[in-house]
């Protein structure tokens, strides 16, 4: 390692906050972020002596004049607040370099992806981006007497800070090339237009009067216009009353709600799930169950996950944007506002905008957004609820144009985005609860975490429904899920009495034990040859979608299901035929209009698709199946049962034999 004597153009000053017991206030420091430095360092004058320890292994550093110096003091796991969020510095070395605290490349990598612009940087914490503004005038506070002056009841005057903005500092660097200053300036220039446009369309207020065109409107209608929905108010704890007071004031300031004289009323309550605990704030929810029963639905269907994933086939680079409280950007007409009236400790209010909780809500924003876009945007952009995904397949230049087009369209329409949630020019991106990574995809880690947080002993049917719901969400990634679910699914029958025993708990434990991770599945490209492999047993059917790419086969999806009671009486050959049909239906969005290959270990299937059935009464079912299959273009390849990878895989991974 060596020292250099000029500021890395890839580094900036940001405000960091340290807090120690016994000190009268937070220690506000100007931290230097330097991707060229391999270490995090701090002055002994900004961290109390008791937090420093002697390093087990002193670090030898070679400086510019060839002299070796030793870093002997280290501070471990130091919390620091940046951009309002709590980060942890794993290891911090003591070194007097003329700045209070330096965040090196190891810190940037820990909270990657690390993105920097001319006026701010982005770290990522718990899969959320944290925006931290750049300080243009930096000071060194850590001088002799600073810590003493900050102690509670201290009579020591606080030393004057030193302006270090223009100073030339010496920083530790690891062997290798640095980011060239000219290259850095080119990168900043390249994104400046997108930065400026994103700034123009972003706001913390979803109906910002300076940016929103407020043209998006919606109507909610009662099935029977004479119906009055009244659900009695709930009781609230003192802490909930305080939280309601804060949130109602915020909503009134945003002008998304107003006091109501409506004859309708639905109760509001607070929820605190994992997401709410992470952000440290409960979420207000209105129980519109009764109102949803009394109102007409919306005919617009949301695209399913497979439809959206099909759109990004072959794409290599992505950007995503979160519409700021997307539903709140859609205004309600006066009659519809009355239907949204809710009660809370502060009184009776109604929404000026579409609230969360209405059954029509999920489709309102994407329908309105989609109707405002021409088909040209659908080639590289899709919308799901209030998330916008932009995707390109030829490189950054094309993607730059696509992103700029969408941002300009948002500005024209007055659609407000959340700046802090924007993800730009990513080869890997989180969307729809999935991690999409250049041709592969798998559920995000929190899906697996939710599964493992369920106790082995389930309390009631509702809790079991939630558990099975998460498994179903991840069904594309779990072979033979139908047979795994079956022992638990039977407990949800309406006429069954709830029971749970030790054997059930053991089964739950084994399910979680076997779900250690989700596989990364291949996302087929348009020119790939597609293959399905199927199998059937007495009660279940299953299949795999594969793709042949550059002479290699990749697994794309799993599918499985149960035969109905009547179907379980079919002959085994018929079950094999039905399994093929079910698997084709499951993967039809990929198989139409492609020519694909069906692999099966059932010899009768090849015979079945080639014979001409007479269509008499006894063969009616087979005739219907044959006619249905005729709409698809496929070849058939028979494989021996011993070579049916899918069947073998199912046998090896089934959980039903564990209990």
Curated annotation (Swiss-Prot):
Residue ranges for the region (Protease) are: 1-180
Q: Which InterPro entries does the entry link to?
A: DNA/RNA_pol_sf (IPR043502), Pept_A3A (IPR000588), Rev_trsase/Diguanyl_cyclase (IPR043128), RT_dom (IPR000477), RT_RNaseH (IPR041373), Viral_Replic_Matur_Polypro (IPR051320)
Does the keyword section mention NAD?
A: no
Q: Which reaction does it catalyse?
A: DNA(n) + a 2'-deoxyribonucleoside 5'-triphosphate = DNA(n+1) + diphosphate
- Give start and end of each Reverse transcriptase domain: 252-436
What SUPFAM superfamilies does the record point to? DNA/RNA polymerases
**Alphabetical list of Pfam families matching this protein:** Peptidase_A3, RT_RNaseH, RVT_1
Q: Please provide the Gene Ontology terms (biological process) for this protein.
A: proteolysis
This chain's function reads: Encodes for at least two polypeptides: protease (PR) and reverse transcriptase (RT). The protease processes the polyprotein in cis. Reverse transcriptase is multifunctional enzyme that converts the viral RNA genome into dsDNA in viral cytoplasmic capsids. This enzyme displays a DNA polymerase activity that can copy either DNA or RNA templates, and a ribonuclease H (RNase H) activity that cleaves the RNA strand of RNA-DNA heteroduplexes in a partially processive 3'- to 5'-endonucleasic mode.
What family is this? Answer: Belongs to the caulimoviridae enzymatic polyprotein family.
Q: What is this protein called?
A: Enzymatic polyprotein
Protein's organism: Carnation etched ring virus (CERV)
């Amino acid at each position: 390692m060596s020292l250099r004597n000029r500021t890395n153009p890839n580094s900036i000053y940001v405000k960091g906050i340290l807090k120690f017991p016994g000190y009268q206030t937070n220690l506000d420091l100007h931290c230097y972020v330097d991707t060229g430095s391999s270490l995090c360092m701090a002055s002994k004058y900004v961290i109390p002596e008791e937090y420093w320890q002697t390093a087990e292994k002193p670090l030898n550093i070679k400086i510019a004049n060839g002299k070796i110096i030793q870093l002997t003091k280290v501070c471990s796991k130091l919390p620091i607040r940046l951009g309002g969020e709590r980060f942890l510095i794993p290891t911090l070395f003591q070194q007097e370099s003329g700045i209070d605290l330096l965040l090196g490349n190891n810190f940037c990598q820990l909270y990657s992806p690390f993105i920097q612009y001319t006026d701010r940087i982005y770290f990522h914490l718990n899969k959320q981006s944290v925006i931290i503004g750049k300080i243009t005038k930096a000071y060194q506070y850590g001088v002799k007497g600073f810590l003493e002056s900050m102690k509670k009841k201290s009579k020591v005057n606080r030393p004057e800070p030193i302006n270090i903005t223009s100073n030339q500092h010496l920083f530790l660097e690891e062997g290798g090339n640095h980011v060239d200053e000219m290259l850095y300036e080119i990168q900043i220039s390249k994104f400046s237009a997108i930065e400026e446009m994103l700034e123009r369309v972003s706001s913390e207020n979803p109906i910002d009067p300076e940016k929103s065109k407020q043209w998006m409107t919606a109507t909610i209608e009662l099935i029977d216009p004479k119906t009055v929905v009244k659900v009695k108010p709930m009781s609230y704890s003192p802490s909930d009353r305080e939280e309601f007071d804060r949130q109602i004031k915020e909503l009134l300031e945003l002008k998304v709600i107003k006091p109501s004289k409506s004859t309708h009323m639905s109760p509001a309550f607070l929820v605190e799930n994992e997401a709410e605990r992470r952000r440290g704030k409960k979420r207000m929810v209105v129980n519109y169950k009764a109102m949803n029963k009394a109102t007409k639905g919306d005919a617009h269907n949301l695209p399913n996950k497979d439809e959206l994933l099909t759109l990004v086939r072959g794409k290599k680079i992505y950007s995503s944007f979160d519409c700021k409280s997307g539903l709140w950007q859609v205004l309600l007409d006066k009659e519809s506002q009355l239907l949204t009236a809710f009660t809370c400790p502060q009184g009776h209010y109604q929404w000026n905008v579409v609230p969360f909780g209405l059954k029509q809500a999920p489709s309102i924003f994407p329908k309105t957004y989609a109707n405002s876009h021409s088909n040209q945007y659908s080639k590289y952009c899709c919308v799901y609820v209030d998330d916008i995904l932009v995707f390109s397949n030829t490189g950054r230049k094309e993607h730059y144009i696509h992103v700029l087009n969408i941002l300009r369209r948002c500005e024209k329409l007055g659609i407000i985005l959340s700046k802090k949630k924007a993800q730009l020019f990513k080869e890997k991106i989180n969307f729809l609860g999935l991690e999409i990574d250049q041709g592969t995809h798998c559920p995000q880690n929190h899906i697996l975490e939710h599964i493992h947080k369920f106790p082995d002993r389930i309390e009631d049917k509702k809790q079991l429904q939630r558990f099975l719901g998460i498994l179903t969400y991840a069904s594309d990634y779990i072979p033979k899920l139908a047979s795994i679910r079956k022992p638990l699914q039977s407990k949800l029958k309406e006429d069954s009495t709830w029971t749970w025993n030790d054997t059930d708990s053991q089964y739950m434990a084994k399910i979680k034990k076997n779900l250690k991770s989700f596989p990364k599945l291949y996302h087929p490209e348009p020119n790939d040859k597609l293959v399905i492999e199927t199998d059937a047993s007495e009660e279940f059917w299953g299949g795999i979608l594969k793709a042949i790419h550059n002479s290699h086969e990749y697994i794309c999806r799993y599918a499985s299901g149960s035969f109905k009671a009547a179907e379980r009486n079919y002959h085994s050959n018929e079950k094999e035929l039905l399994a093929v049909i079910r698997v084709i239906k499951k993967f039809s969005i990929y198989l139409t209009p492609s020519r694909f290959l069906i692999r099966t270990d059932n010899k009768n299937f090849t015979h079945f698709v080639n014979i001409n059935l007479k269509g008499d009464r006894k063969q009616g079912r087979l005739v219907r199946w044959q006619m249905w299959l005729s709409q698809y273009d496929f070849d058939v390849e028979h494989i021996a049962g011993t070579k049916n990878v899918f069947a073998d895989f199912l046998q090896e991974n089934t959980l039903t034999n564990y209990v």
